[in-house]
Curated annotation (Swiss-Prot):
Homology family: Belongs to the CBF/MAK21 family.
Cellular localisation: Nucleus membrane; Nucleus, Nucleolus
UniProt protein name: Nucleolar complex protein 4 homolog A
Principal cellular location given in the protein's record: nucleus
Lipid bilayer topology: Multi-pass membrane protein
Transmembrane region(s): 307-327, 358-378, 386-406
Pfam families according to UniProt: CBF
GO biological process: ribosome biogenesis
Cellular component GO terms, alphabetical: Noc4p-Nop14p complex; nuclear membrane; nucleolus; small-subunit processome
Length: 526
């Protein structure tokens, strides 16, 4: 009985919704047919505040159709709009007053749809966003400003500002809607003005919150900024949401250098604030590919990267990529860089998520043949000591890594040829020393690799046995070993070819004394 009542109520509600949608269509037709029906616009806008999701969607579509026609027919007042409640001078005609009134209704409509960006239904949020971007496109094509306006391009920056302000909420997570907005960032003009507006928004929130950015706001800003892809060449700039109708050589949205400049500015103002650990990691993960290459002056990131490198742990590992670019491509001088890199070699380095990335970068940093011998020896020795407690999948990468260091620096061969190899008790190497220059690694030997020759895993033993033979000049390729896992080792063992049968004695043993033919078994029974 209750189920029947529920179905009946749903049918009644659906009929009401259909009736409201039909009413919206009727009012839209009436407004477009005659100016005498203009007051019906209020009824259309009222439906934007409905509690029914489907009615709100219908109202958004109706309002979009209405003002699209109004903009195309130039039915909205163009120029500085007087206040609605103010007294208008007699110089304005009835035509002007009607267009002013309709322009105010358009502004009210845009404000209502902006509020819907925070609607409980994502479908309504998405539709509201697409409608607002449609308004931006139409305003660009049919400007609401006088032709004497300074910006000859007349991009509707003000409406875009309101959209961005609603996407970058301080308390509500808008990352899903920002992801939907990402497709509009493919338009070069939208991308450029989004960056300028975001820069202003971050500055405004910063002043409001006494130089501290709320965590949710930071997440929203990062989601938006990380969605921005700057073209590599200026010739790629030509995709505009608002059609370009002027030929202005100084038009900034068409200049790659201006894109890079504002891109750099907005990232710098965002990164100067303290970030959460998770956000720190996200920024560093994309820094070397998505941020540094598109900055006018990548060296401006020195302070951020050096501060991140000094944090320690995973943050320091992730900062290596950016530092590598600045050191090798932009001649950054970092006096204690290798000392810090050396200090990152801890047992935990073998178990972190970014292990492969770290050793890939460490291999590049240690590839120079101009490094001091004591420094390379310290890295080789520290890795060898850590290898004593490392899992097999890591050892298969660490041992060739150490051997490559020795190949690059023949002076380090003393570490594997020194007669007095010693052991843990007599080893002069100081594991606790953070300064590689004071670790006495060059006075030690790589006896740890000899210990690994007794490892339980056969592949590790074969890798460690390399030092028992003369090292070849050709370096080992460790790229395929950086991400090897224990599961891969296990699968490899399981796939090894097994003997179909094991040869056994064909005559079974009887008793403790062996076969029946044995002389002892013939005289004694057990």
């Amino acid at each position: 009985m209750a189920a029947r009542k529920t179905k009946h109520a749903c049918r009644i509600q659906d009929k009401r919704s259909d009736a409201e949608r039909q009413d919206l269509d009727t009012k839209l037709a009436a407004v477009l047919e005659s100016r005498g029906n203009a007051n019906a616009v209020f009824d259309i806008l009222e439906h934007l505040e409905s509690k029914k999701e489907e009615v709100v969607q219908a109202a958004i579509r109706t309002a979009s159709k209405l003002f699209e026609v109004m903009l195309e027919k130039r039915e909205l007042y163009i120029g500085d709009l007087p206040a609605e409640n103010g007294t208008l001078p007699d110089t304005y005609s009835a035509e002007d007053k009607y267009k002013m009134w309709m322009r105010h209704r358009y502004n009210s409509c845009a404000a209502c749809i902006l509020d819907l960006l925070q609607h409980s239904s994502f479908s309504n949020q998405e539709l509201a966003l697409c409608t607002l971007m449609k308004f931006i496109q139409l305003e660009g094509k049919f400007p609401l400003e006088n032709s004497e306006w300074k910006d000859s391009y007349r991009f509707p920056r003000e409406l875009l500002k309101f959209v961005i302000d609603n996407l970058l909420q301080e308390e509500a997570d808008c990352t899903l809607l920002i992801t939907r907005f990402q497709e509009y960032l493919e338009y070069d003009d939208v991308r450029y003005y989004t960056m300028t507006v975001t820069n202003d928004c971050v500055s405004r929130v910063q002043q409001k919150n006494k130089l501290v950015l709320p965590p949710v706001f930071q997440t929203n800003v990062f989601c938006l900024l990380s969605s921005i892809n700057i073209p590599v060449e200026e010739s790629a700039l030509g995709n505009f949401l608002v059609t370009k109708n002027v030929n202005n050589e100084d038009w900034k949205p068409s200049k790659l250098k201006d894109h890079k400049r504002v891109f750099e500015r907005v990232w710098m103002i965002f990164l100067k604030h303290q970030l959460s650990v998770s956000l720190y990691k996200k920024v560093l993960l994309i820094l070397h590919e998505s941020i540094l290459p598109h900055m006018s002056k990548p060296t401006l990131m020195i302070d951020f990267l050096t501060a991140a490198y000094d944090v320690g742990g995973a943050i320091s590992l992730l900062a290596l990529n950016g530092l590598f670019i600045l050191i090798h491509q932009h001649n950054l001088e970092y006096p204690d860089f290798y000392k810090k890199l050396y200090s990152l070699l801890e047992p935990s380095i073998f178990h972190v998520k970014y292990r492969a990335r770290f050793f890939h970068l460490a291999n590049m940093f240690l590839s120079s043949t101009h490094l001091p011998v004591y420094l390379v020896a310290a890295f080789a020795k520290r890795l060898a000591r850590l290898a004593l407690t490392a899992p097999p999948q890591v050892l298969l990468m660490i041992i060739p890594f150490i051997c490559n260091l020795i190949r690059r620096h023949p002076a380090c061969r003393v570490l594997i040829h020194r007669p007095s190899a010693g052991d843990l008790a007599t080893d002069p190497y100081i594991m606790e020393e953070q300064d590689p220059a004071k670790s006495q690694a060059l006075e030690s030997s790589l006896w740890e690799l000899e210990v690994l020759q007794q490892h339980y895993h056969g592949d590790v033993v074969r890798a460690a046995n390399v030092i028992s033979r003369p090292l070849s000049a050709q370096e080992s390729d460790i790229s395929g070993l950086l991400e090897i896992s224990s599961c891969e080792l296990y699968d490899k063992e399981m796939k090894k070819k097994k003997f179909k049968s094991v040869p056994l004695e064909y005559e079974p043993v009887r008793g403790l004394l062996g076969l029946k033919s044995d002389i002892t078994a013939q005289h004694f029974t057990f």
